[in-house]
Amino acid sequence: MPEVKSMFREVLPKQGQLSMEDVPTMVLCKPKLLPLKSVTLEKLEKMQKDAQEIIRQQELALKEQPPSEKAE
Protein backbone atom coordinates (compact mmCIF):
# COMPACT_ATOMS: atom_id res chain seq x y z
CA MET A 1 0.00 0.00 0.00
CA PRO A 2 1.59 3.31 -0.99
CA GLU A 3 1.97 5.86 1.78
CA VAL A 4 0.14 9.15 1.42
CA LYS A 5 2.34 12.21 1.90
CA SER A 6 0.88 14.70 4.33
CA MET A 7 1.59 18.39 4.46
CA PHE A 8 2.91 18.03 8.03
CA ARG A 9 6.22 16.40 8.82
CA GLU A 10 6.46 14.20 11.92
CA VAL A 11 8.97 15.49 14.45
CA LEU A 12 10.17 13.31 17.33
CA PRO A 13 12.06 15.09 20.14
CA LYS A 14 15.59 13.94 20.89
CA GLN A 15 15.16 14.61 24.62
CA GLY A 16 12.28 15.30 26.98
CA GLN A 17 8.86 13.74 27.14
CA LEU A 18 6.83 12.63 24.21
CA SER A 19 3.15 13.33 24.71
CA MET A 20 0.27 12.14 22.62
CA GLU A 21 -3.24 13.56 22.67
CA ASP A 22 -5.89 10.90 23.18
CA VAL A 23 -8.79 11.46 20.83
CA PRO A 24 -12.06 9.85 21.93
CA THR A 25 -13.56 7.57 19.33
CA MET A 26 -16.97 6.01 19.03
CA VAL A 27 -17.31 2.49 20.38
CA LEU A 28 -20.16 0.47 18.97
CA CYS A 29 -21.86 -1.70 21.56
CA LYS A 30 -24.11 -4.67 21.00
CA PRO A 31 -27.72 -3.43 20.75
CA LYS A 32 -30.01 -4.26 23.63
CA LEU A 33 -33.31 -5.84 22.66
CA LEU A 34 -36.23 -4.43 24.58
CA PRO A 35 -39.63 -6.13 24.69
CA LEU A 36 -42.42 -4.37 22.83
CA LYS A 37 -44.72 -4.92 25.81
CA SER A 38 -43.75 -5.12 29.43
CA VAL A 39 -44.63 -8.18 31.49
CA THR A 40 -46.98 -6.09 33.62
CA LEU A 41 -48.83 -4.79 30.56
CA GLU A 42 -49.22 -8.35 29.24
CA LYS A 43 -50.65 -9.47 32.61
CA LEU A 44 -53.11 -6.55 32.65
CA GLU A 45 -54.24 -7.30 29.10
CA LYS A 46 -54.75 -10.98 29.97
CA MET A 47 -56.79 -10.05 33.07
CA GLN A 48 -58.93 -7.67 31.00
CA LYS A 49 -59.47 -10.30 28.30
CA ASP A 50 -60.46 -12.89 30.92
CA ALA A 51 -62.90 -10.44 32.55
CA GLN A 52 -64.50 -9.65 29.19
CA GLU A 53 -64.86 -13.37 28.46
CA ILE A 54 -66.59 -13.95 31.83
CA ILE A 55 -69.00 -11.06 31.17
CA ARG A 56 -69.76 -12.41 27.69
CA GLN A 57 -70.50 -15.88 29.13
CA GLN A 58 -72.79 -14.38 31.79
CA GLU A 59 -74.69 -12.41 29.13
CA LEU A 60 -75.14 -15.55 27.03
CA ALA A 61 -76.39 -17.45 30.09
CA LEU A 62 -78.97 -14.71 30.80
CA LYS A 63 -80.22 -14.81 27.19
CA GLU A 64 -80.62 -18.60 27.29
CA GLN A 65 -82.74 -18.58 30.50
CA PRO A 66 -86.51 -18.91 29.98
CA PRO A 67 -88.56 -15.72 30.67
CA SER A 68 -90.16 -17.22 33.80
CA GLU A 69 -86.78 -17.48 35.56
CA LYS A 70 -85.84 -13.87 34.71
CA ALA A 71 -88.90 -12.50 36.57
CA GLU A 72 -87.87 -14.06 39.88
Curated annotation (Swiss-Prot):
Subcellular location field:
Cell projection, Cilium; Cytoplasm
Loss of this gene results in the following: Embryos display defective melanosome transport and disruption of the ciliated Kupffer's vesicle phenotypes. BBIP1 morpholino knockdown results in bilateral cystic dilations of the pronephros. Pronephric cilia of morphants are abnormally short and fail to maintain a parallel orientation to the anteroposterior axis of the duct. Morphants also show increased frequency of situs inversus compared to wild-type and abnormal retinal development.
Q: Which UniProt keywords apply?
A: Cell projection, Cilium, Cytoplasm
Give the UniProt record's GO annotations in the biological process aspect.
cilium assembly; Kupffer's vesicle development; melanosome transport; receptor localization to non-motile cilium
- What GO cellular component is one of the record's annotations? cytoplasm
InterPro entries, alphabetized? BBIP10 (IPR028233)
The residue ranges crossing the membrane are: none
**A family per Pfam:** BBIP10
* Record function comment: Required for primary cilia assembly.
What does the similarity note say?
Belongs to the BBIP10 family.
**Can you say what this protein is called?**
BBSome-interacting protein 1
Species, as recorded:
Danio rerio (Zebrafish)
Taxonomic lineage of the native organism: Eukaryota, Metazoa, Chordata, Craniata, Vertebrata
